[in-house]
Amino acid sequence: MSDQIKFIVDSLNKEPFKKNYNLITFDSLGPMQLLQVLNDVLAEIDPKQDVDIREEMPEQTAKRMLNLLGILKYKPPGNATDMSTFRQGLVIGSKPVIYPVLHWLLQRSNELKKRAYLARFLIKLEVPSEFLQDETVADTNKQYEELMEAFKTLHKECEQLKTSGFSTAEIRRDISAMEEEKDQLMKRVERLKKRVETVQNHQRMLKIARQLRVEKEREEFLAQQKQEQKNQLFHAVQRLQRVQNQLKSMRHAAADAKPESLMKRLEEEIKFNSYMVTEKFPKELESKKKELHFLQKVVSEPAMGHSDLLELETKVNEVNTEINQLIEKKMMRNEPIEGKLSLYRQQASIISRKKEAKAEELQETKEKLASLEREVLVKTNQTREFDGTEVLKGDEFKRYVSKLRSKSTVFKKKHQIIAEFKAEFGLLQRTEELLKQRQETIQHQLRTIEEKKGISGYSYTQEELERVSALKSEVDEMKGRTLDDMSEMVKKLNSLVSEKKSALAPVIKELRQLRQKCQELTQECDEKKAQYDSCAAGLESNRSKLEQEVRGLREECLQEESKYHYTNCMIKNLEVELRRATDEMKAYVSSDQQEKRKAIREQYTKNITEQENLGKKLREKQKAVRESHGPNMKQAKMWRDLEQLMECKKQCFLKQQSPASIGQVIQEGGEDRLVL
């Protein structure tokens, strides 16, 4: 209990309370002062509890504190009967009740602050089921539950952000930088608006630019969707290939293997899996649980200093030495009996370690095989993306090689044919050049003949006329085809329009009927809604009146209950004071001297006489000190002068005894002397 009180006093003297208590002053606090201290601690956890209990009824104070302690999940010691005493002790400010509560609150104040904060938003309001029959109340209650769930998720995200390393200073700097950037952008936008307003049709151009931006955003969104679908397709292809490879390997194994080998392999797999499940995994799980238990234990304990760690290390070393001594003693006692058993144990431990090592090696090999298969799958997908082909394996590669050989022979033949064609092409090209040269000479001769005859340019004009007539015939043919196509297109469009009209006629007729029906239903709905609103308003007014009456009656009931409990507490306090007064009167009136000595009056009178005698002695002592003060000061001064005189004589004597003064004549105030 003393450690508990010491912890409470130390905590109350620190921030944010700064009470400046010690053990005696804290122990001498009255019930109301203790309750005020408890209320201050609760107000530090939940700011809504910051009230002066002198301005509050005791029952209301106890009810408020009990409600908050219930929210904070404080469990009073004892059973149901102790709960009533706990409530009563909380009302009257009993120390055995208040001290454990203060100790519990001050030990985990940060955790309780968080719990009190969450309780403001996560304690669900109980709505009676008859009120939930109303649709408005039900919708509001549903919205309230959804907001509560949203608060839970937001609080989790907030805690994750707090633990993720982001500091508020960095966020504030980012916000200030964003605000500056926002101001700059607003200024730029204003300048651009002023520049754009001078341009003609700027509204239309802004509208087009807005549409362009929307379309670009839509294009980016579609590109993102396309990329996501590509990724999904890629993953689906990977899964498909993985499953196909598994199926192929299983078919290959089933085709090549016999039932005996399959059974043997299955038995080996079953043995390995059973060993992993029954021996290896439970051991690892047990070790992880122990490690977790130790870590939780370390986290729950308070932080240790260097001295505590040194003390724990010394204890661990002592325990290890004791264990080693006990093991040596046991081995010395049981060495002749358990010699063979220790050998067998060593062999069994070696075998178990080898078994565990092989199991781990097999597990690592399986993981490595799986990673290699994933890598092969990635490489095959990359090759497929690059050139659209797949990596061949086994028999497929052999077939590919044989096919490649046959294609190489065909390639050689085709290459030979191409060489022949190239040679023939060279001959034809040379023939073409010769014919062009011959044509040029003939054209030159023709032009000279035309000049001689006086009809120069006749051949050129003839060629141009032929070329233009050919072009005109081609254009006329194209025009005719275009007109035919246009007429056919018009016919098709007319037929489509007539078909759509005939198809939409019953739909339009049905739509008219539905519109008429919709108007009737909306009119009926408006009438029903008006009736509902009037009825709901009447019921709401009645409900509000009833709620006010119930609220008033509850407040009266609470006031009467608080008065009743306060009266009971005052009666008990008066009974205690009356009992003490009667005991005092009995002791004072009693003829027995022992009883009289126990009386408080006698004790106080005795203390008063003792203090008076002590004061008288002290005054006499003070008088004696005052009388002897002057002579004592004079005597002290004389002693100091004597000490100075003796010190001066000592210095003179030391000078006389020094060797530097031998053979010198020393002349002082009295006589002349020769020191030999």
UniProtKB/Swiss-Prot annotation:
Q: Which GO terms describe its biological process?
A: cilium assembly; intraciliary anterograde transport; intraciliary transport; intraciliary transport involved in cilium assembly; regulation of smoothened signaling pathway; sperm flagellum assembly; spermatogenesis
* Positions of region (Disordered): 611-632
The annotated consequence of gene deletion is: Mice show impaired spermiogenesis, abnormal sperm morphology and significantly reduced sperm number and motility. In addition to oligozoospermia, spermatozoa show dysmorphic and non-functional flagella.
Q: Tissue range of expression?
A: Highly expressed in the testis (at protein level). Co-localizes with RABL2/RABL2A in the midpiece of elongated spermatids within the testis (at protein level).
Keywords attached to this entry: Acetylation, Cell projection, Cilium, Cilium biogenesis/degradation, Coiled coil, Cytoplasm, Cytoskeleton, Developmental protein, Differentiation, Phosphoprotein, Spermatogenesis
Complex and partners: Component of the IFT complex B, at least composed of IFT20, IFT22, IFT25, IFT27, IFT46, IFT52, TRAF3IP1/IFT54, IFT57, IFT74, IFT81, and IFT88. Interacts with IFT74; the interaction is direct: within the IFT complex B, IFT74 and IFT81 mediate the transport of tubulin within the cilium. Interacts with tubulin; the interaction is direct. Interacts with IFT57 and IFT70B. Interacts with RABL2/RABL2A; binding is equal in the presence of GTP or GDP. Interacts with IFT88. Interacts (via the IFT74/IFT81 heterodimer) with RABL2B. Interacts with CFAP61.
Q: What protein am I looking at?
A: Intraflagellar transport protein 81 homolog
Name the lineage. Eukaryota, Metazoa, Chordata, Craniata, Vertebrata
